[in-house]
């Protein structure tokens, strides 16, 4: 019932040098080929001197100040063209 060697699982999880080298090469390959939105992080702390940070107004035409709104979203309510059932829908004005 009990294993003859108490630490037998340590040997099963060990990795040899060729596997470690292959894992390192794959990690470097995938890290090198990841894309980011900007190349350097030097522009993170840039502040526009002409922008008033105390003014918390949201730009018009933008959703939460980030995404532009192109079309207004209609109200979600049942219409005569949709959400009707059977003959009652055909007979109702």
Swiss-Prot record:
Task: Name the GO terms of the biological process aspect.
Answer: floral organ abscission
Cite the entry's keywords alphabetically.
Secreted, Signal
Main location (coarse class): secreted
**One cellular component (GO) term of this entry:** extracellular region
> Domain of life here?
Eukaryota
Found, by tissue, as follows: Expressed in mainly in buds. Lower levels in roots. Detected at the base of pedicel, in the floral and funicule abscission zones, in vascular tissues, in guard cells of young seedlings and in hydathodes.
Annotated signal sequence is 1-35
Location comes to: Secreted, Extracellular space
Misc remark for this entry? IDL4 is only partially redundant with IDA.
Question: According to its UniProt entry, what is the function of this protein?
Answer: May be involved in floral abscission.
Q: What is this protein called?
A: Protein IDA-LIKE 4
Gene name, per UniProt, is IDL4
